[in-house]
């Protein structure tokens, strides 16, 4: 620029260096969504705290209207882990976490005693998952109604249930255990042959 003084004009050379704003994390400095995704994989609690901070939109979304609108839509979700998971899936930084069960068809013969069994659930991929477990049959007693990523040992969770013999009628009894995430569902069909009740009064 030109500096004007009483002694005349002087051309002054200058340059600006723009320093991109970053945030310090346990993995080092982070300033893009690739860095953030890596943080989610190794320290989800730290990532959640950053995701909900004022710095997230400023540093990681950088004025991108599409990303900011997506973030705002998901921000008020009751479960912040689900919000963060869906955000990363929507921007294609990860695939949706899926799950499977060991056996969808189960048959039992019950004769005078309760029976305990379990469903082996295996998750595929990394990230957060919440599973809702439902069974309307009164003779099936479920151990859990909700399962999250924290309940798994490695990639496996064993869901226990009990068949209550006292609530069975004679002949076949049918039940469905439904395990659902927001993107996937598994249905376990159960058939129980209950003991026939013999009337000796006559």
What feature does the model see in each segment?
Residues 2, 54-60, 78, 95-98, ...:
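Surface-exposed binding patches on compact interaction domains or structured appendages
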Residues 161, 188-201:
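Internal, hydrophobic cores of structured domains that mediate oligomerization or house catalytic pockets
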Residues 68-71, 77, 149-155, 166-167, ...:
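Terminal accessory carbohydrate-recognition/targeting modules of carbohydrate-active enzymes
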Residues 17-18, 23-124, 166, 199-202:
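Beta-sheet-dominated interaction scaffolds and their linkers
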Residues 12-14, 127-135, 172-174:
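Short, hydrophobic/aromatic beta-strand segments
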Residues 1-7, 119, 159-165, 169-183:
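A short beta-strand micro-motif common to beta-rich folds, especially ectodomain repeats
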Residues 10-18, 185-193:
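Edge beta-strands of extracellular beta-sandwich domains
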Residues 7, 103-105, 138, 144:
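Extended low-complexity, intrinsically disordered segments associated with secretion/export
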């Amino acid at each position: 620029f030109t500096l004007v003084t009483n002694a005349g004009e002087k051309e002054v050379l200058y340059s600006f260096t723009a320093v991109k704003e970053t945030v310090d994390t346990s993995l080092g400095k982070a300033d893009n969504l690739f860095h953030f995704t890596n943080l989610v994989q190794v320290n989800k609690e730290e990532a959640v705290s950053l995701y909900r901070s004022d710095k997230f939109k400023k540093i990681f979304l950088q004025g991108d209207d599409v990303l900011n609108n997506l973030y705002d839509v998901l921000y008020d979700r009751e479960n912040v882990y689900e919000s963060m998971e869906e955000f990363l899936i929507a921007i294609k930084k990860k695939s949706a976490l899926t799950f499977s069960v060991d056996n969808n068809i189960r048959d039992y013969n019950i004769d005078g005693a309760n029976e305990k069994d379990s469903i082996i659930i295996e998750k595929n991929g990394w990230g957060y998952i919440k599973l809702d477990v439902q069974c309307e049959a009164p003779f099936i007693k479920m151990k859990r109604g909700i399962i999250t990523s924290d309940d798994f040992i490695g990639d496996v969770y064993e869901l226990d249930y009990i068949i209550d013999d006292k609530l069975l009628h004679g002949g076949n009894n049918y039940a469905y255990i439904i395990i659902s995430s927001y993107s996937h569902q598994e249905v376990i069909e159960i058939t129980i042959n209950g003991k026939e009740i013999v009337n000796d009064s006559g």
